[in-house]
Amino acid sequence: KEKMTVIDKIILTADEHHVMDIAHPSYWKNKRGEHPAPFTTISWWEVLSGEWIPFGDKDEVIDYLRRLIENEEYKHMIWPEHCLYGREGAAITPVLMEAVTCWAREGKYYEVVEKGLNPSTEFFGAFRANIPLEGDADTKFNMKLKDELESYDVIWLAGEAKSHCVANTLRQLFDYPEVVRRLVILEDCMSNISGCEDLAIPIYEKAARMGARFETLFRLLRSLFFLQY
């Protein structure tokens, strides 16, 4: 709040998922009618063999899982039901929203990028689904958002989870090095999903090679203090 006058724009992302989402347990059953436990990984050959039976069209699901591998996306993992459409869990964290609201009262506008409503594809990054789907423009790369980021000199990046949504947002910008070079990644304003600490290391290493900066919030605020005085 103390340094909010230096912020020109705040862009938040909000995940929203249906209960019957391809990454939720209810979407899947095995031959015994059991749902997978959270953090189970499912491959296309396990669907082909009948080990896991999807709620959606089997052939389309197999194609989706194959394309994850072909496009070097993360393995398909089952998560606990989260960010359910219309429920409290899909809302922006209240303490963050309070700070954003105070900032907006100074005559500024924030933006919320909603993602994840198509139940047939994961949507980690802010710009596109893990596998964009034909017939759903909302799953394809958000060029408007990328173009807006290009209008700013410095872009602070933070959020949850470091290993998944933040990392994939970063990776989806690798085709736009001029944006990556403007990024300041706030390392102490994010955390990994437990057990996935090493998953995104190559992404962050590549971002550093491309010119992204890594800072803590304390160092960032201290640098802003010296710039102002």
Language-model regions: role of each:
Residues E2-I11, H17-Y229:
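Active-site-adjacent betaalpha module
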